[in-house]
Amino acid sequence: MSTEQDVVRKAPLFTALDEAAAASLRASMDSVKIVKGSVLFAEGDEGDHLYVIVEGKLKLGTSSGDGRENLLSILGPGEMFGELSLFDPGPRTSTATAVTDAKLLSLGQEKLIPWLAENPDVALHLLARLAQRLSLIHI
């Protein structure tokens, strides 16, 4: 199994994938490289992609009213972010900035929907995991 495929299977929404489903999903994803200090997306940008970190670290933050940054999280390999935008495209609620050079896998809504249609058993698990994550943030 490739490192990227292993990272996909460890991402919270995709833990139930078997090797074949993980390989199929990985084939639907795009590789993204970002250099230290670069902004992947900014708070308020439109979004419809989730990202899984393969290598490196990113930080998620928001801007306060007085212009200061509120750090939400530092994320590393195997962690995922942006998943809500797959089902509710709209403005991003935070800014994602590379803390180190990083390699990511990106999955857009336009590729996820057909993949789920081909893997309906995974779709139910995905919805259950998404509901779990939402309950953790009290939405």
Question: Model segments located where?
Answer:
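Cytosolic regulatory regions built on CNB/CRP/Popeye-like sensor folds
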Residues: M1-I139
